[in-house]
Amino acid sequence: MQHRGKYEFRRGIGKFGGKYQQAKGPADRLYGKNLSKVQRILILDFGSQFTQLIARRVREMGVYSEILPANTPLQEIESHRPSGLILSGGPHSVFDPGSPQSDPKVLDLGIPVLGICYGMQWIGRALGGKVEPAATREYGFTRVRVSKPNSPLFKGFPGAETNTWMSHGDEVRELPEGFVESARSHSSSLAAMENPERRIFAVQFHPEVTHTERGIEIFRNFLQICGVHGGWNLGDYATHKQKE
């Protein structure tokens, strides 16, 4: 669950680029015959006010990203041949009637997945973990300790404590099968979990906002897990548009 707070974050477009051919969408019109060279990260939007900011963070690292609704059919997601998926946060509880849902089979595509806030809770519930209302709602700055030294998502700061931005009322109480804890908050709630074999990662906080001190490193590590490389920038896009 995500609070629609008073904080506003600048929106914008940074760099993006890549490797894989995709089906249809803005990138097809943008790249034309060169689309086969485009790598991309797909972001499934569960309604977060920060979803555009997630896309910006990825693009700023030179990797193309696209945002799709959370309920996008599995076949359409597969047609994009993404290098990785990011599941956004959202304002709902996973227990709310009509709360956003994705096809659980998106977790079986064999590509890396990063769940954020609601995305983490959705993963936990979809894979058989226990998600419950938190005893105390976490909102605002929260200290988090990395508890898994060899976590690829937290590469570069194992054992470290860092400030994060939390905004949730539900939490994962019991891990899904095959998952391990990778970070915990000072209030003793689970802050991150992962299944290294399936390359599914999830964080309860928001790495996309500047309030999270090392959020950029988390995105950089996730893109490394996905095996994507930057190489396309906004200047190329401007040149392309001028030639149209």
What are the language-model segments listed below?
Residues 110-114:
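Conserved pre-ATP/AMP-binding loop-to-beta segment of ANL
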Residues 3, 7-9, 16, 20-22:
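Cationic, low-complexity basic patches in intrinsically disordered or flexible, solvent-exposed regions
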Residues 115, 119, 124:
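Gly/Ala-rich beta-loop-alpha elbow adjacent to hydrolase catalytic centers
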Residues 26-31:
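Short, low-complexity intrinsically disordered segments enriched in A/P/G/S/L with frequent Arg
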Residues 86-88:
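Structural motif
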